[in-house]
A protein has these predicted regions:
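Nucleic acid-binding interface residues in structured DNA/RNA-binding domains
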Residues: 2-119
Length: 119
């Protein structure tokens, strides 16, 4: 049985990503690149994306709060959640995140800016 992310993936990398994503408050977003940098892996945005795409539902990770650098919901294929692109937008909007007419979030307004991920 999988008890945490490091057990599932054989390394602590996904666990570090999940720990940072858990800190994103309601009504804020972070980018994949931002999450990668905050976990000590600058320029590894795709690794953050892979980790979130593989998130077991049981971990209760707020994966929906992570978007791409253009402020958009990235297309994803989640094994347990068909329609997750629409779901991601719905969840963000329910938390007060606003999308413009082009489907973008204003990152200057809604980006999470932590002082430290260790606090």
């Amino acid at each position: 049985m999988v008890t945490d992310a490091s057990d599932r993936h054989g390394s602590p990398v996904y666990a570090r990503i999940y720990a940072v994503v858990k800190k994103i408050p309601r009504g804020k977003v972070a980018t994949y690149g931002q999450i990668a940098a905050l976990t000590g892996m600058p320029r590894h945005a795709r690794q953050a994306g892979y980790a979130l795409a593989a998130t077991p539902e049981s971990l209760k990770i707020p994966w929906h709060r992570v978007i791409n650098a253009q402020g958009r919901v990235s297309l994803r294929l989640r094994h347990w959640d068909s329609g997750s692109d629409d779901l991601q937008r719905i969840l963000l909007e329910s938390e007060g995140v606003v999308f413009d007419g082009n489907g973008r979030v204003n990152l200057e307004k809604f980006r999470w800016n932590p002082k430290s991920v260790h606090s």
